[in-house]
Each structure stands twice: as structure tokens, then as C-alpha cells.
Amino acid sequence: MPTIEQLVRKGRQAKPKKSKTLALKGSPLRRGVCTRVYTTTPRKPNSALRKVARVRLSSGIEVTAYIPGEGHNLQEHSIVLVRGGRVKDLPGVRYHIVRGALDTQGVKDRKQGRSLYGAKKAK
């Protein structure tokens, strides 16, 4: 326990915050190539077939990324943009694919909350 005098002289040292998205290497987004596109099941108590992809990033690291929205056009060798953000019920999935960027099409017929899904305004 430091004395008041020691705290006045040195102060407290803040612990460095650990990044949750190490594969992005400090970038907000990274480009990558899909190596495998598949479905996986969430952990209890949920039940579904979640769409995910293994992506080799431009940083050289291979990660598992979630494909949000209903329906997608991704296959092996598709070029995608990856952002951080985990999926709570899929263990090991800590990244999201950005819809409407590079080879990924936006979600079709989406009317509300379009921004996150790369959907254009309906005419």
C-alpha cells in the first residue's frame, strides 16, 4: 500500500487496455479472402444455423467471421471486408463481415436498419 506522499510523487499507473480484435492489428477494418464458407450451430440455449466464413486477412492471420443478415452471395475466394465485433452465441467468432463492401452484396429487400447491411434506399 503506497503512502500519500508516494502517490503524490508517482501517482497510479493505469493498466493498458487489451484489444479484443488482435487480427486487425489496430485497424478499424481489414480486407481478406474467404477460405471456407459454412454454417455452424450456436451454443445453448439457442438453436439455428449461423452463417460464418474462414477469412485469411491481409495481415496474414486467418479468422472466423460472421456473415450478418438474411441470405448472402459469398463463396470460396470472395474478397471481403472484416470489422471487429463478436457473436455472443458462437464461440471463437470475434469478427463480422461488412455487407455491401467489395464482393459482399447488401441484404435484399431490407427496409429498416439498412446501414449495417449495405442495403440501398428503396425507390
Curated annotation (Swiss-Prot):
Keywords on record: Methylation, Ribonucleoprotein, Ribosomal protein, RNA-binding, rRNA-binding, tRNA-binding
InterPro entries linked: NA-bd_OB-fold (IPR012340), Ribosomal_uS12 (IPR006032), Ribosomal_uS12_bac (IPR005679)
Basic residues composition-biased segments: 9-20
One CC-aspect GO term: small ribosomal subunit
Modification sites for 3-methylthioaspartic acid: D89
Single Gene Ontology BP annotation: translation
Region (Disordered): 1-21
Entries under Gene3D superfamilies matching the protein: Nucleic acid-binding proteins
Ribonucleoprotein is among the record's keywords: yes
Gene Ontology molecular function: any one: structural constituent of ribosome
Job of this protein: With S4 and S5 plays an important role in translational accuracy.
This protein's name: Small ribosomal subunit protein uS12
Organism: Bifidobacterium longum subsp. infantis (strain ATCC 15697 / DSM 20088 / JCM 1222 / NCTC 11817 / S12)
Species classification: Bacteria, Bacillati, Actinomycetota, Actinomycetes, Bifidobacteriales
